[in-house]
A protein has these predicted regions:
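Acidic/His- and Gly-rich active-site-bordering loop/insert found
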Residues: 2-120, 141-146
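Alpha-helical metal-binding/catalytic segments enriched in His/Glu/Asp
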Residues: 90, 115-159
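Charged, amphipathic alpha-helical interaction segments
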Residues: 83, 137, 175-176
Length: 178
């Protein structure tokens, strides 16, 4: 490992330590939203839960200084502009399946248990969505201009039909850049 790689690892470690509480706070914000598919409503094609989760994720991303867009409630995204309009998209989703039985606590109230975040969506896929945003935030804070635009996509219908992803192929969302 050369000195540049060692320095980068130190920067990442420092960022993770500094961001730990924010990561947990933002995960809790999303996990605490019951984003199970519901009845369609204006701006909420998969129900109000997925809509609220999408709005919350976009608010978190906007607070990090990322460019955000809500594509009619189907999908949203947060961009970290790069040196070119080419994009690398990191796909996440904010909808969850119904909680089912076997929970010892409220599945829509994230808690920490033995050092682990517990709640519906912590692993699939709200937790990874938050971590992906923090990766973009790391590059932004470091002043790194990637050779491409980094786009974090937030789906709202992965668990029950993937109709959100279809929007990417039928609209300008895939080509739109800030």
């Amino acid at each position: 490992m050369d000195e540049n790689e060692k320095r980068l690892l130190r920067q990442i470690d420092a960022f993770v330590k500094r961001s730990h509480e924010g990561i947990l706070r933002d995960m809790k914000t999303l996990v605490d939203i019951k984003s199970v598919q519901g009845e369609p409503a204006p701006g909420a094609p998969f129900g109000t839960g997925p809509k609220r989760a999408l709005e919350a994720a976009l608010e978190i991303a906007s607070g990090m200084g990322l460019f955000t867009r809500n594509c009619e409630g189907y999908v949203g995204y947060a961009d970290l502009p790069g040196k070119s309009e080419k994009q690398i998209a990191l796909i996440t989703h904010l909808d969850v399946v119904p909680e089912g039985s076997g929970w010892t606590g409220d599945p829509f109230c994230m808690t920490l248990r033995d050092g682990f975040a517990v709640g519906r969506g912590t692993a699939d896929d709200k937790g990874p969505a938050v971590i992906t945003l923090y990766a973009a935030k790391f590059f932004k804070e470091q002043g790194v201009k990637l050779p491409y635009t980094l786009r974090v996509l937030f789906g709202t219908n992965e668990e029950t039909g993937m109709q959100d992803v279809c929007l990417l192929y039928t609209s300008d969302a895939a080509d739109d850049t800030p």
